[in-house]
A protein has these predicted regions:
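Short glycine-rich or small-residue beta-strand-to-loop segments that form or flank ligand, phosphate
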Residues: 6-16, 75-77, 115-121, 147, ...
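Short, ordered loop/turn segments at secondary-structure junctions
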Residues: 12-14, 42-47, 80-81, 122-123, ...
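Short glycine/serine/threonine-rich phosphate/pyrophosphate-binding segments
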Residues: 16-26, 49-50, 100-103, 123-131, ...
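Short acidic, glycine/serine/threonine-rich loops at helix termini
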Residues: 19-22, 50-56, 87-88, 128-133, ...
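Glycine/threonine-rich beta-strand-loop-alpha-helix active-site module
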Residues: 27-32, 36-60, 130, 136-179
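Glycine-rich nucleotide/cofactor/substrate-binding loop typically near the N-terminus or early
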Residues: 30-112
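Accessory alpha-helical/coil subdomains and C-terminal extensions
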Residues: 108, 119-121, 127-131, 135-142, ...
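C-terminal non-catalytic interaction/assembly regions of soluble proteins
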Residues: 271-409
Length: 409
């Protein structure tokens, strides 16, 4: 096995409450068990790798690495770049016409003398890293790639719990605890809380659960119209089940009539297929990102749901609040910090042993923290809508159990 002399860190994709802390724990662990290993960070993810833009981990950074665990965001920056999307890389000026981004990135790693690449990102980030390692292996350059699973959607196979997701749910609940008070600014207020989650409803479920637990600890004064019912969650919609607008409006209308407001939690990916179909019928173009995913900020599920229910519930005011950026940029909570530290320290051990993969709780091995093999890494893991705690929450708020996927007309 080749001796590890130099490692590089790279964060990519959207933010999550684990990027800065993951790097902090990785640096600290290398400094503890392999102090002679040199370390660098590629600035702005794969963009920095393609451009040869990196920053050295100095002695000062080594000594104070754990400061990074108290912060959100990424100190070295992110970007959304797919190395196999040649057209996009050329368009953005990251490579010249005729160049293969994989080769450019591979050559940069070789020139920098990198033995281990630590990628912190979602399934796209880590499978791209696997492609890079495979490319280098064909060219007789043994690169060890050890990823950490970052996604607040918690939708990566076979990772039982992705880093930062618990924090994102907690922060989303805090966000709504404030903005829900806006329903007192207008009569018949419809408040939509749009939560991140392209294909998976886990974060929406968990955010609603955290929020309702916060309400459990909150004192109210019903005698002066300060009631829990007005601030509670009245509906939760996720991508894995359909929204029956007519049936739900019939259920929610009496609530609106009684408490003068309705509060809905909805995943940003709920009903997307139907919204896109409507956009295409109108001749509108649906923008996509570098990975071919529809730009959800352009699809705007929250606005769509708000408009449909606003009419059906005779709302005088419809407000859509998105907690995503607030939640994903937070520093990790104590529960996440423990998981991040365990995974980061395991990642260093794997790297020094020459073992590639994505380190996290392997749901196929009793949630043991280990390097999950790259061929098993895949996004789009759905939330289990049959989960007992989810169904119990729906029962508590008076919402029927979810049915098959897709939105009813």
């Amino acid at each position: 096995m080749k001796e590890v002399k130099k490692v590089a860190f790279l964060t990519a994709g959207g933010l999550a409450p684990c990027l800065s802390s993951s790097i902090g724990f990785l640096i600290d662990e290398y400094n503890r068990v392999a102090p002679n290993v040199k370390m660098i960070g590629y600035v702005n993810g794969y963009m920095g790798l393609l451009k040869g833009d990196s920053i050295e981990v100095t002695d000062e950074v080594r000594k104070n690495a754990l400061v990074l665990t108290r912060h959100g965001g990424s100190p070295i920056g992110n970007s959304r770049v797919k190395l196999t999307n040649v057209k996009d890389c050329v368009k953005r000026g990251l490579v010249k016409p005729g160049e293969d981004p994989l080769k450019v990135a591979a050559d940069q790693l070789v020139n920098d003398g990198v033995d281990v690449l630590h990628t912190i990102g979602g399934d796209d980030t880590n499978t791209t890293a696997a492609d890079l390692a495979a490319y280098l292996a064909k060219n007789d350059y043994p690169l060890i790639v050890v990823g950490l699973p970052k996604t607040i959607d918690n939708d990566v196979y076979p990772i039982k719990q992705s880093l930062g997701a618990w924090t994102a749910a907690e922060e989303g609940a805090k966000f709504f605890m404030n903005v829900v008070k806006e329903n007192s600014a207008n009569p018949r207020a419809l408040t939509i809380h749009e939560v991140m989650g392209r294909n998976c409803g886990w974060l929406t479920y968990k955010t609603a659960q955290c929020y309702r637990k916060m309400l459990d600890k909150t004192r109210f004064l019903p005698g002066f119209m300060l009631t829990r019912e007005r601030q509670d969650v009245h509906a939760v919609y996720v991508p894995e089940s359909k929204i029956d607008f007519k049936a739900e409006a019939a259920r929610l209308l009496p609530i609106m009539d009684k408490v003068d407001s309705v509060n809905i939690f909805v995943s940003e990916g709920a009903g997307v297929a139907d919204i896109i179909a409507e956009m295409k019928k109108r001749g509108e173009e649906v923008p996509v990102d570098a990975f071919g995913h529809p730009r959800l900020d352009k699809v705007n599920v929250g606005q769509y749901v708000g408009k449909r229910f606003g009419e059906l519930l005779k709302a005088e005011k419809v407000q859509v609040f998105k907690s995503g950026y607030f939640a994903r940029a937070a520093a990790p909570n104590k529960k996440d910090l423990k998981l991040i530290e365990k995974c980061a320290r395991c990642a260093v051990a794997c790297a020094l042993n020459g073992e590639s993969g994505v380190v996290g709780p392997d749901e196929d091995q009793s949630a043991k923290i280990r390097a999950c093999e790259f061929p098993r890494i895949k996004g789009g893991k759905p939330f289990n809508v049959r989960k007992g705690s989810f169904r119990k929450m729906l029962q508590d708020i008076g919402q029927p159990n979810p049915r098959k996927k897709r939105t009813a007309k």
